[in-house]
């Protein structure tokens, strides 16, 4: 497969960072859901996509990585859902062509920042096509693997796998809170490296559980805007009683997420949006059909 950027204003550069948070112990919220050890400090892998005026050609970014991540995805699905998909089904994804480059010259100006925080057993690479497109419009885009919650994270010391669903979490709110600290740790790391970006202008994209973590981050830090893709807000509501918006927030609901929870007796995400989101002047809602 080949992912091309449409209507790009800039070429896109790529780099990965290994973030070690020496003053933060491994949270229970993550080690109870994975093969992380309790006696360790927090480590994160972070992808950064940045705009450049250099020319690029499509490259097979993941071709030579040690782990076949397509196979890892299939193993996770088989383990989680009790199915028997052939492990080679997605192996071709390692050969994907992406319209990005490495070691590109940066723009003279410092670009605004967009942070991507994934959902439960998600991955920093799952929205790569969207993130590259955003970077091509002049943004520095930072995608975080929330180690232990992510489907897999290939740390230098070994691969960490998510092994637990929401039922295995002692408190889902704590997962979201610790994810919001991951975001802060990542931004602090990049700022301390004097990374070439405008960290006074930060927006966030949060998918599902990442929507909760992004909202919590913005409650404590200045955010330009908040983009919520099928946000998982019920655990937040159960913890704090209301969802108080503090910045421009765009709620994007897919058809399967919206319709799939309309008829259940428990509180659902659509009801949270309709009845418990406060400061609605900050909110815009979007509904996507044919999303599945």
Which residues fall in each region the model found?
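Gly/Ala-rich beta-loop-alpha elbow adjacent to hydrolase catalytic centers
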Residues: 119, 205-210, 214
């Amino acid at each position: 497969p080949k992912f091309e950027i449409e209507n790009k204003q800039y070429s896109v550069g790529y780099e990965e960072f290994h973030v070690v948070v020496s003053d933060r112990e491994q949270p229970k919220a993550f080690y109870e859901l994975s093969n992380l050890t309790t006696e360790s400090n927090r480590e994160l892998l972070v992808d950064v996509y940045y705009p450049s005026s250099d020319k690029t050609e499509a490259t097979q970014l993941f071709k030579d990585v040690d782990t076949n991540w397509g196979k890892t995805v299939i193993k996770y699905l088989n383990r989680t859902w009790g199915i028997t998909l052939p492990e080679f089904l997605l192996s071709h994804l390692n050969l994907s062509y992406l319209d990005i480059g490495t070691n590109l010259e940066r723009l003279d100006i410092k670009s605004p920042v967009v942070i991507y925080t994934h959902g439960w057993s998600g991955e920093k690479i799952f929205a790569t096509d969207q993130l590259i497109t955003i970077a091509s419009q002049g943004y520095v885009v930072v995608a975080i693997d929330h180690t232990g919650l992510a489907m897999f994270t290939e740390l230098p010391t070994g691969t960490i796998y998510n092994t637990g669903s929401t039922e295995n979490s002692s408190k889902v709110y704590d997962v979201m809170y610790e994810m919001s600290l991951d975001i802060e740790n990542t931004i602090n790391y990049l700022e301390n490296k004097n990374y070439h970006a405008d960290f006074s202008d930060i927006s966030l994209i949060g998918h599902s559980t990442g929507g909760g973590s992004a909202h919590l981050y913005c409650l404590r830090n200045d955010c330009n805007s908040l983009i919520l893709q099928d946000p998982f807000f019920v655990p937040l509501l159960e913890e704090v009683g209301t969802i108080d918006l503090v910045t421009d927030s765009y709620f994007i609901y897919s058809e399967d997420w919206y319709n799939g929870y309309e008829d259940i007796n428990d509180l659902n995400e659509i009801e949270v949006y309709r009845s418990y989101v406060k400061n609605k002047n900050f909110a815009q809602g979007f509904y996507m059909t044919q999303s599945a």
